[in-house]
Amino acid sequence: MELDEVIITRAIFDEYSKTFLDYTDIDVALVGGGPANLVAAKYLAEAGVKVALYEQKLSLGGGMWAGGMMFPRIVVQEEATRILDDFGIRYKEYESGYYVANSVESVGKLIAGATSAGAEVFNLVSFEDIMIRENDRVTGIVINWGPVTTQRLHVDPLMIRTKLVIDGTGHEAVVCNTILRKIPNAKIGELGLLGEKPMWSEVGERLAVNATQEIYPGLIVAGMAANAATRAPRMGPVFGGMLLSGEKAAKLALDRLKTI
């Protein structure tokens, strides 16, 4: 067969355009492609939810790729190994209760698990703003191309309608910060301000799950964004809390969708 470059171009443009249009009205928008949102994406998609994940960078995985200080290994607690099992991620016990996995394999299989389950990924697409309706409830997200955002180009965005948003943007908690900045008298969490505390792995891991919640009408926080939204400590390259937070975020979203 002789390849035709124009057909290649048309195939890519046509198929992506159809997908993009189909996902302008969805059930759940996951902002940020880190481990918590990848876990949530898999479980939501498996439940039949129309879910899309938006990541500003080219690659997904957040800070998991590099493990700890570029040593490509991560630690996971025993209670989260069942999620590793769900994704087919290999691990071994280092000491009692401490399990070690290859960070590159972990990210690859998290991505494969989410996409194989049916979650649609839009990488190189950045979150710019939220959409609101009555009582300032979150009803969608405003997006642009990632390079437009990073290069600070003056290009108007496009909009996605969604029933729920999950902020999985890590330390920056970008969606939460947008709400605080743009909605008068909006309150995120009990303290109404953002930013995680310094390192305390034990407390940070525990609170990552506890802090995963619908923190504002239409907005669920997950992963490190949940810690940032509730002033909980950071935890470093131990990822059990991130995985369990993603699982909890999916469960919360499924329950909430029944009421919308």
Swiss-Prot record:
UniProt-listed Enzyme Commission number(s): 2.4.2.59
Gene Ontology biological-process entries: thiamine biosynthetic process; thiamine diphosphate biosynthetic process; thiazole biosynthetic process
Keywords: Iron, Metal-binding, NAD, Thiamine biosynthesis, Transferase
Amino acids binding Fe cation: D156, H171
Gene3D superfamilies: FAD/NAD(P)-binding domain
Catalytic activity of the protein: hydrogen sulfide + glycine + NAD(+) = ADP-5-ethyl-4-methylthiazole-2-carboxylate + nicotinamide + 3 H2O + H(+)
GO MF annotation terms: iron ion binding; pentosyltransferase activity
Entry keyword Iron: yes
Highest taxon above the source species: Archaea
InterPro entries assigned: FAD/NAD-bd_sf (IPR036188), Thi4_fam (IPR002922), Thi4_prok (IPR022828)
Residues binding glycine: R234
Residues that hold NAD(+) according to the record: A36, E55, Q56, G63, H154, V155, D156, M224
Cofactor: Fe(2+)
Matches recorded under Pfam families: Thi4
Pathway linked to the protein: Cofactor biosynthesis; thiamine diphosphate biosynthesis
Quaternary structure note: Homooctamer; tetramer of dimers.
Family listed: Belongs to the THI4 family.
Function: Involved in the biosynthesis of the thiazole moiety of thiamine. Catalyzes the conversion of NAD and glycine to adenosine diphosphate 5-(2-hydroxyethyl)-4-methylthiazole-2-carboxylate (ADT), an adenylated thiazole intermediate, using free sulfide as a source of sulfur.
The protein's name in its UniProt record: Thiamine thiazole synthase
Species, as recorded: Methanosarcina acetivorans (strain ATCC 35395 / DSM 2834 / JCM 12185 / C2A)
Gene: thi4
